UniProtKB/Swiss-Prot annotation:
InterPro entries: Aminotrans_V_dom, Aminotrans_V_PyrdxlP_BS, Pser_aminoTfrase, PyrdxlP-dep_Trfase, PyrdxlP-dep_Trfase_major, PyrdxlP-dep_Trfase_small. GO terms for cellular component: cytoplasm. It catalyses: O-phospho-L-serine + 2-oxoglutarate = 3-phosphooxypyruvate + L-glutamate; 4-(phosphooxy)-L-threonine + 2-oxoglutarate = (R)-3-hydroxy-2-oxo-4-phosphooxybutanoate + L-glutamate. Binds 1 pyridoxal phosphate per subunit. GO terms for biological process: L-serine biosynthetic process; pyridoxine biosynthetic process. Disulfide bonds: none annotated. Belongs to the class-V pyridoxal-phosphate-dependent aminotransferase family. SerC subfamily. Its EC number is 2.6.1.52. Catalyzes the reversible conversion of 3-phosphohydroxypyruvate to phosphoserine and of 3-hydroxy-2-oxo-4-phosphonooxybutanoate to phosphohydroxythreonine. It is found in: Cytoplasm. This is Phosphoserine aminotransferase. Pathway: Amino-acid biosynthesis; L-serine biosynthesis; L-serine from 3-phospho-D-glycerate: step 2/3; Cofactor biosynthesis; pyridoxine 5'-phosphate biosynthesis; pyridoxine 5'-phosphate from D-erythrose 4-phosphate: step 3/5.
Length: 368
């Protein structure tokens, strides 16, 4: 047993609120007096339908989702949405646009290009322009007005990049399709600025196994009839999200997280905490005199995934090892980037971030 509190900085599946885990533990084998677990519950039972309904309504309230938007709890992760969004929304259009700002938006662009006859245009490429150290401003995106949509990722978990202001396009432009997997519920934004939002749950929503999709109702008219029903948004909505058996336990856990976030004061309150957490780490990095390195442009630094490194890979490995011995876990950076990555999603308490900052200063004192 560790002598230190354990803080999980994993990029995903990620830390869950302690209060949520306690509730799940208490209800594990006997949900609400039923005598059995949610994992054993029929997805068509009144009990589970109530869980699903409350999860949807709580998410709608937290994000202020307008009435003309539908919410789905699907499977397959955000990577499935790379294809599903294009298959459903690009039908009948000559082009659709994509913005590449890092690892995941690059993969999305590549995947979208495979499964549709529509040409997927590059509206901007942060790798070519900035070597993934800055973000192409929205006003520089080369968007074709008659494109089916514009796809982008607002936060790049691997590269540690995030748009400071959540992007929006002017009226008359194509709808925005946004991968919000790693930042949804972390700050306020206007859902009405988007045509479709999707997010894998395993970062800011709940455990892996469910993917949230929020889609504007009029866009469902685009869904073609010649794609498999399981990949058709309209098919899922026509069956009230029950086209196939949903990820019942992951939805239940996500609902607990929504209730926890409401108890914290909602998205506005958690946004202020998230800002302070990120500020704490970036001030530690910038105040290290170059011992810790983060080359991201200050205006493009992620408040969810703080990436940094030292002057050598050997020292990086020592940092990760010694941090884990002090209860600061899963700080190793993504394999293609290296270094360290501290993922500080909603459920990461400020105390955990302060403990990491203290360790960083102590590590620098000993090895700097």
């Amino acid at each position: 047993m560790s002598l230190y509190p354990i803080y999980n900085f994993s990029a995903g599946p990620a830390v869950l609120p302690e209060a949520v885990l306690r509730t799940a533990q208490q209800e594990m084998s006997d949900y609400n007096g039923t005598g059995f677990s949610v994992m054993e519950m029929s997805h068509r039972s009144e009990m589970f339908l109530s869980i699903l309904h409350h999860a949807e309504q709580d998410l709608r309230q937290l994000l202020k989702v307008p009435d003309n938007y539908k919410i789905l709890f699907l499977q397959g992760g955000a990577t499935t949405q790379f294809n599903m969004a294009a298959m459903n929304l690009a039908h009948g259009f000559r082009t659709a646009d994509a913005v590449v700002t890092g690892n995941w938006s690059r993969i999305a662009y590549e995947q979208m290009s495979r499964l549709t006859d529509t040409e997927i245009r590059l509206a901007a490429h942060g790798g070519e322009q900035f070597d993934y150290l800055d973000l192409p401003p929205v006003e520089t995106w080369d968007v074709a007005p008659d494109s089916a949509f514009v796809h982008f990722a607002v936060n790049e978990t691997v590269n540690g990049l995030q748009y400071r202001e959540v992007p929006r396009l002017s009226d008359g432009m194509p709808p925005l399709v946004c991968d919000m997997s790693s930042e949804i519920l972390s700050r306020e934004f206007d859902v009405a600025d988007y045509g479709l939002i999707y997010a894998g749950a395993q970062k800011n929503i709940g455990p892996a196994g469910v993917t949230v999709v929020i889609v504007r109702e009029d866009l469902l008219e685009r869904c073609p009839n010649d794609i498999p029903d399981v990949f058709n948004y309209r098919s899922h909505l026509n069956r009230d999200g029950m086209y196939n058996t949903p990820s019942t336990y992951a939805i239940y856990m996500s609902g607990l997280v929504f209730r926890w976030l409401q108890a914290q004061g909602g998205v506005k309150k958690i946004e202020a905490v998230n800002r302070l957490k990120a500020q704490t780490l970036y001030e530690t990095i910038d105040g290290s005199g170059g011992f810790y390195i983060n080359d991201i442009h200050p205006d493009a630094r992620s408040k969810m995934n703080v990436v940094f490194k030292t002057a050598s890979e050997d020292l990086d490995r020592r940092f990760v090892l010694e941090a884990e011995l002090q209860g600061l876990c899963l700080l190793k950076g993504y394999k293609s980037v290296g270094g360290m990555r501290a993922s500080i999603y909603n459920a990461m308490p400020l105390e955990g971030v302060r403990a990491l900052a203290d360790f960083m200063r102590d590590f620098q004192r000993r090895y700097g």
